[in-house]
């Protein structure tokens, strides 16, 4: 890359590297270097930046960095229609509640600029604004499968192409209607998946009341409406990011007691955001389930708090539009949940249903998860020890079944009636009976909790010790209120820090806690403790450490007799105290 000095060559080089099947970590590193080069502000450079933003979004649920990157490159690429389309699509998919405000600022900004595509950009922004103000379905502005990139060519965007085709169909339909009843057009191409007509930019406000009236008659919101049959034909070809989300809200009485806080339940999600309105119902396997409210979402899935009979459950609903690898991860998760069904350590699966368009998973309902409790702050050491011990027992249960979870993080530990349980087995790996590790084809997990060996290279060996690292990161976050890599603001820096890792900073005054964290976060996987080692660690058992006793005895003797202290005398006193303590404990 050092010998590349123009944007076209740089873009082509990056595409060649992707075609060669490089790892996600390597790809991120290449794009980070590419965006640092000065190669001009043309469409090739823009495409490189947009691909970089996509990588940032693939690596985290936090949209802050991607949003800041869009703002940073705005002055460089505001003259290109593709910049505005990508930025608006990003804000729509991020669910930004201030979309209208952002659009108005963008329109005002473009109006005072002069560039070739100004008219086209303004028409696009004003049409999105009209849709947003009138509560229209904004999915029409989200890109479909991308075609080959040809800078300089005046190619219609996916939205414009669809709008143009629909406008053409409307004219044809009108001609058929005017020619009499013998000439009928069913008008299928005029409708989106939600059943609403897409209008040309100058028709955005037309017939809005009719559209609303038509929707008000539906028993379920668009997110639960039946999809068109042709959606199945695109399965496996439309790239979409499936995110794993937490699915609980509120804090149980037991957790409140531990934290000394109360937390009221949140209000129902807005139907306009795609959530199901309260008290609506859905039929799964012939059984009626009452929707109480939406409690989580991410990618193509949403999670609802539901009532089935007299019991409350969590219902995960996954829209089956995505690559087959991600669908496979959900099937893997279901199989593993059934494997652990009936165990006290794992959230229980109640039932599931795989339909043509949706996957439903009915799960045990939890009041909150560990990430929410950590964000509240001020955790006592007794609470941390209790949760830590439960987490160790959970992971021990998983490891006994020869399974590496690969994505342990606070959001995946759910509190159910005060007891900690594990959720989300989407990317877990099963170890064969004749091995102690697995060969991972790609990086998996969340960077803040990923072990160095999981991110350093493609096809790296990952063993149970990788989960031990993740547990150490979670303990670090419970003790320090932030994960070990919190001081590094972006994904690239986090990965580079892991690759160059020596040791993290520890500010806790609890020496036993620091000791167990350091042991879990050893760079060499072979030097990390086992689950049994951690369960018997003095951080949990309270057993006095001989080394700590030596330090204490030495300090006392120095106070009493000066700087010169006989090391053998120190050892004898420390060992005697240690032996006495063990006898008292017995």
Curated annotation (Swiss-Prot):
Q: Which UniProt keywords apply?
A: ATP-binding, Kinase, Nucleotide-binding, Serine/threonine-protein kinase, Transferase
Q: Which residues are listed for ATP binding in this entry?
A: 295-303, 316
Q: Which GO terms describe its biological process?
A: meiotic spindle assembly checkpoint signaling; mitotic spindle assembly checkpoint signaling; nuclear chromosome segregation; protein localization to kinetochore
Extent of Basic and acidic residues compositional bias: 167-188, 199-217
Reactions catalysed according to its record? L-seryl-[protein] + ATP = O-phospho-L-seryl-[protein] + ADP + H(+); L-threonyl-[protein] + ATP = O-phospho-L-threonyl-[protein] + ADP + H(+); L-tyrosyl-[protein] + ATP = O-phospho-L-tyrosyl-[protein] + ADP + H(+)
Region Disordered: list its residue ranges: 167-223
* Catalytic residues (UniProt): 407 (proton acceptor)
Q: Which CDD domains match?
A: PKc_Mps1
Top-level taxon of the source organism:
Eukaryota
Q: Which GO terms describe its cellular component?
A: kinetochore; nucleus
What Gene3D superfamilies does the annotation carry?
Phosphorylase Kinase, domain 1, Tetratricopeptide repeat domain, Transferase(Phosphotransferase) domain 1
Q: Which InterPro entries match?
A: Kinase-like_dom_sf (IPR011009), Mps1_cat (IPR027084), Prot_kinase_dom (IPR000719), Protein_kinase_ATP_BS (IPR017441), Ser/Thr_kinase_AS (IPR008271), TPR-like_helical_dom_sf (IPR011990)
**GO MF:** ATP binding; MAP kinase kinase activity; protein serine kinase activity; protein serine/threonine kinase activity; protein tyrosine kinase activity
* Cysteine pairs bridged by disulfides in the record: none
Going by the record, the broad EC class of this enzyme is transferase
Q: Which PANTHER family match?
A: DUAL SPECIFICITY PROTEIN KINASE TTK, MIXED LINEAGE PROTEIN KINASE
Q: What does this protein do?
A: Involved in mitotic spindle assembly checkpoint signaling, a process that delays anaphase until chromosomes are bioriented on the spindle, and in the repair of incorrect mitotic kinetochore-spindle microtubule attachments.
Q: What is this protein called?
A: Serine/threonine-protein kinase MPS1
